[in-house]
């Protein structure tokens, strides 16, 4: 199965992040990659939750402060002692080779250059070792889709630890694939190998659909899996896919070192609440005991600001990364982050928040 996609390496002119989707759709469909674009863009069932993720940011307004002597904005922050130049990070996204020939390698390089954080998926088009080798010791996280086979889990995690990752992301909201009609219509099957899978079993995922890939995942995840991963790796474990305050409390009690508030960009359960809707309640019960990462629906610097003001410590983006990757490779991904950083900086100064801590003290109405 041959697959050819973008190999462009260039800065991308961006007016707003949402406009990138149409540009990428046109390019990928012209290349005969309609199914791949549908996989990247699509959401579950009626895509209500996917749309609500972005729309929900308009349910809150920023209460700006003035006359505070703020002539610049400081975006720097940190997590687990890792210093970052921006609170915006890349969400782990599978199969980035669908968007660009260099896939995760270009994304990892971009994250290093903008001072952000790269996370690689179990289902990446690049191995965890190759992604780590692409950068000069820049911090990376590994996203684990836990398998039914603990030998496979330990094998993968050992690879990740040897590659120098700084934390493990346990994906809790994706024990099977959401019903995405676009994938069904396009008869989408993965055209590129997934090296992390192939290294253990020889089965690289080529020619398989989403449901076949997820069939090997552990459907019956339990809280004790958190400690199991910590014992295997001696690394912090972030639980990704938390949408309920009780789950957040139970995950922390079970040893979680971080909470990732996410509904997988509306790709899994349709009809569930927007991530931004549930964030304040989760932040309240977490009460700063562990860091909170937030994603789903972020398309503006204003959205980043509102998520931080609602209790998030970092804000992740998924689809926009792949759109930038398709349009310009490493430089395209950098363009996405530079644009969002610019919007966030403007919002901060106009709202009267000089740094990330000041954003957290800002009232939303």
Language-model-detected regions and their locations in the chain:
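An N-cap/entry alpha-helix motif that binds or orients negatively charged groups
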Residues: 2-81, 180, 188-221, 357-359
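Short beta->alpha linker loops
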Residues: 44-45, 122-126, 148, 243, ...
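C-terminal helical cap(s) of enzyme catalytic domains, especially alpha/beta-barrels
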Residues: 53, 271-284, 325-345
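Glycine-rich active-site/cofactor-binding loop and its immediate structural neighborhood
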Residues: 84-126
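Short, basic, glycine/proline-bearing loop/turn elements
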Residues: 89-95, 138-145, 210-212
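Alpha/beta enzyme core
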Residues: 95, 109, 134, 150-294, ...
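A gly/proline- and charged-residue-enriched helix-loop-helix capping module
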Residues: 113-153
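Charged C-terminal helix
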Residues: 342-365
């Amino acid at each position: 199965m041959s697959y050819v996609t973008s190999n462009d390496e260039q800065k991308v002119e961006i007016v707003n992040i949402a406009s990138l989707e149409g540009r990428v759709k046109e390019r990928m469909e012209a290349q005969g990659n309609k199914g791949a674009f549908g996989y990247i863009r699509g959401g579950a069932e009626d895509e209500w939750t996917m749309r609500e993720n972005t729309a929900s940011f308009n349910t809150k307004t920023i209460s700006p402060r003035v006359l505070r002597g703020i002539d610049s904005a400081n975006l720097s922050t940190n997590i687990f002692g890792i210093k970052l130049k921006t609170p915006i990070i890349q969400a782990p996204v599978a199969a980035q080779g669908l968007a660009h020939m260099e896939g995760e390698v270009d994304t990892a390089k971009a994250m290093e250059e903008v001072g952000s954080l790269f996370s690689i998926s179990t289902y990446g088009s690049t191995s965890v070792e190759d992604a780590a080798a692409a950068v000069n010791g820049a911090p990376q996280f590994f996203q684990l889709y836990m398998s039914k086979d603990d030998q496979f889990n330990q094998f993968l995690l050992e690879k990740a630890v040897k590659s120098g990752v700084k934390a493990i992301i346990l994906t809790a909201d994706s024990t099977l694939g959401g019903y995405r009609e676009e994938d069904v219509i396009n008869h989408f099957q993965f055209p590129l190998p997934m090296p992390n899978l192939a290294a253990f079993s020889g089965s690289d995922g080529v020619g398989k659909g989403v449901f076949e890939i997820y069939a090997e995942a552990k459907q019956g995840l339990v809280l004790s899996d958190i400690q199991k991963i910590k014992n295997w790796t001696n690394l912090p474990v972030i639980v990704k896919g938390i949408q309920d305050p009780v789950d957040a409390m139970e995950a922390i009690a079970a040893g979680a070192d971080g909470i990732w508030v996410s509904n997988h960009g509306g790709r899994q359960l349709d009809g569930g609440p927007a991530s931004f809707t549930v964030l304040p309640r989760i932040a309240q019960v977490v009460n700063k005991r562990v860091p909170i990462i937030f994603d789903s629906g972020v398309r503006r610097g204003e959205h980043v600001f509102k998520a931080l003001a609602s209790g998030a410590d970092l804000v992740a983006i998924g689809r926009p990364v792949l759109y930038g990757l398709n349009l310009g490779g490493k430089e395209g991904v950098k363009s996405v982050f530079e644009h969002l950083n610019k919007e966030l900086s403007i919002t901060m100064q106009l709202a009267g928040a000089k740094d990330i801590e000041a954003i957290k003290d800002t009232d939303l109405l």
